[in-house]
Regions:
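Primarily the internal scaffold of c-type cytochrome electron-transfer domains
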Residues: 1-174
């Protein structure tokens, strides 16, 4: 059978790679890798907190990111399709590799969704986030891409979970 093509990329898929260096994949969910990779002890016995089933890497708990703790946002809720794996260009700073910024959702600018836009296609493929021509959705200021899961409805900003389609009205700001 063929591998399923989906817009529902799981957090587990992201963390398989994004668990080193800045460890954002771990810290977002409230985990911190210990300095001593091979220190599996907790309360005088072996720890069950190993990373991705690797018996040589262990983590400690820390407070999760506010977006995960309060809104249970998934990686794909912020990381849009065009920049899921970066924009494909060379930058001096890795934070420039993705198009979306905090301001795009926390101080959004809304545009009317035009016919045949990528946002309409992505929302259709997603199947959980409602979006139609003429709706108002936020844009990435850096790239001009429409963020289809952040919309203006009845003069209120609404965030939609790409995973569940659940509408979360603002403010859920930090």
């Amino acid at each position: 059978p063929h591998v399923e093509l989906t817009t529902h990329i799981s957090d587990a898929t992201c963390v398989k790679c994004h668990n080193r260096s800045g460890r954002i994949g771990l810290s977002y969910f409230g985990h911190y890798e210990t300095e001593e990779y091979g220190t599996p002890f907790m309360n005088g016995g072996p720890s069950h907190y190993n990373i991705l089933g690797n018996p040589d890497r262990y983590y400690l708990d820390l407070p999760p990111d506010v977006h995960y703790a309060k809104a249970h946002m998934s990686c794909i809720d912020c990381h849009t399709m065009p920049d899921t794996m970066g924009l494909g260009l060379h930058y001096k700073n890795m934070t420039q590799q993705v198009g979306i910024t905090c301001k795009d959702c926390h101080e959004p600018h809304f545009v009317q969704v035009p016919p045949n836009s990528l946002a309409l296609k992505l929302a259709f493929l997603n199947g959980k986030v409602p979006l139609k021509v003429g709706d108002f959705a936020a844009i990435e200021e850096r790239t001009g891409q429409i963020i289809y899961n952040v919309q203006l409805i009845d003069s209120k900003a609404v965030f939609f979970s790409k995973e569940t389609g659940k509408a979360i009205p603002y403010p859920f700001l930090c």
